[in-house]
């Protein structure tokens, strides 16, 4: 059995919801284990628990397949 390393992606200060959605879709296809959203990068769900329509449309459901977390400070991740 081949041991696979976990791959994470950090998205920092990306303004475009469509670009974030596209990265979720690409990360899902590439087998990324987790995406961290830092700075003002939009999350798939807003602070009220509603899905961001533009991001969800661009991700084609990948936001439900790839684990993600929002972090205020990128330096706490590095």
Residue positions per predicted region:
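RNA substrate-binding interface of SAM-dependent RNA methyltransferases
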Residues: 2-78
